[in-house]
Amino acid sequence: MYFAVISIFPEMFATIREFGITGRAVAQKQVTIECINPRDYTSDNYRRIDERPYGGGPGMVMMAEPLSQAIEDARLRASQYGCRVDKAHCPVIYMSPQGQTLSESSVVDMTEYDGMIILCGRYEGIDERLLSQYVDMEISLGDYVLTGGELPAMVLMDSVIRRLPNIMGDDKSAEQDSFVDGLLDCPHYTKPHEFAGMAVPEVLLSGHHANIAQWRFRQQVERTQTRRPDLWQAFMPTVEQAKWLKALAKADKK
């Protein structure tokens, strides 16, 4: 999968290109991450990419011209990589607190793309005309504001890359994460058997796979009900999960 990131701080992306699972994916050429600096598309000696806003007000606004040229270059690079450069296969995504909140279901959908062109804003924002002309979607991490779009862009890439086939050591690891099945994840334990006076739940040591699966599902349900009642209210169980819920309810009545 191909990622082009448009940012005035390309050095920040060494974190995701060189470390951890994402770094390994880049090293093994399963993923390509290229950084494009809009300052390279300016024509003045100061390489300015921002100006004061029309109508007055605080702060600066990123200008449309250098960003548009950076996006066009990113599209060219994406096509050379083999991407179908259109909204359906390689969208231009603007990281913005005004965008649609990123979710696990949307991440899974994004794994079907050939690539992404991710636009990282700074200052007060980006000239609206650039957004109207070039941006296919805006994505937010939540109802808060950061100093720029670089960190959200890395979060987006990390979440998508780890869901691609053959990226994780075991693809089932991602399938068992929180939100994947509509519920929070269950607790996990490893050695030692006892820590700070707390022992590993005996059911996990029993070797009885059906009982372990039932225990884990119960923990998911209880955690979701307690910690994220909004998720629980929206939870739509599968046929198999509905059977588990009935079994848990029956066990609780005994």
Swiss-Prot record:
GO CC, one annotated term: cytosol
One Pfam family in the UniProt entry: tRNA_m1G_MT
SUPFAM superfamilies: alpha/beta knot
EC number: 2.1.1.228
GO molecular function: tRNA (guanine(37)-N1)-methyltransferase activity
GO biological process, any: tRNA N1-guanine methylation
Predominant cellular place of this UniProt entry's protein: cytoplasm
Annotated catalysed reactions: guanosine(37) in tRNA + S-adenosyl-L-methionine = N(1)-methylguanosine(37) in tRNA + S-adenosyl-L-homocysteine + H(+)
InterPro entries reported for this sequence: Alpha/beta_knot_MTases, tRNA_m1G_MeTrfase_C_sf, tRNA_m1G_MeTrfase_TrmD, tRNA_m1G_MTases_N, tRNA_MeTrfase_TRMD/TRM10
Subcellular location: Cytoplasm
Binding positions for S-adenosyl-L-methionine per the UniProt entry: G121, L141, G142, D143, Y144, V145, L146
Keywords noted in UniProt: Cytoplasm, Methyltransferase, S-adenosyl-L-methionine, Transferase, tRNA processing
NCBIfam families listed in its UniProt record: PRK00026.1, trmD
Family: Belongs to the RNA methyltransferase TrmD family.
Protein task: Specifically methylates guanosine-37 in various tRNAs.
Identification of the protein by name: tRNA (guanine-N(1)-)-methyltransferase
Naturally occurring in which organism (per UniProt): Psychrobacter arcticus (strain DSM 17307 / VKM B-2377 / 273-4)
Encoding gene (name): trmD
